[in-house]
Amino acid sequence: DTPEVRFEIDEKGHPISTYIKVAKDANKLVEEFMLLANRYVAEKIGKADKGKKPKVFVYRIHDVPDPEKLEKLSAFVAKFGYKLRTEGSKDDINKGLNKLLEAVQDKPEQIIVEQVALRSMMKARYSTHNIGHYGLMFRYYTHFTSPIRRYPDQMVHRLLTRYAEGGRSVNQEKYEELCEHCNEM
């Protein structure tokens, strides 16, 4: 979780100070439910029935970090006295990153280490080719919960409606092009 900076504004609309918005337990609970909903929907559509081909779907995918960026992150956090494992399976690397993020909790260097760690990650993107979501460690993940804010969520809702009504799978190339367009925005 990256801190959200807010501005305090005077009567004339001029910023007079900044502060960090603290996420409340209710916010965290809603976020967890959104993650579960996104995961459930992706898994429900992504897992094909026995003997059937999976239907075309829009996934939110996130690849493993670039090894070179991980090495740079490791060298950076070493200056603060932390060690980061950069070799091994993707699960090993993920555990190492989580261990690092736990170690910096409530330390003066927390924000900078979290930001540099985030920059070492690949960017998540939309695709009809599911590779899972590395950052969340989910095999299936989509964006489903904000159809009024994100067009990919709207695509997911349309596909869900189509499939719930017994419709056939859609043209994968067309949807992959739409995903690529959304990734470029």
Each language-model region and where it sits:
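Append "with occasional cross-activation on large, charged helical scaffolds in nucleic-acid assemblies
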Residues: D1-M185
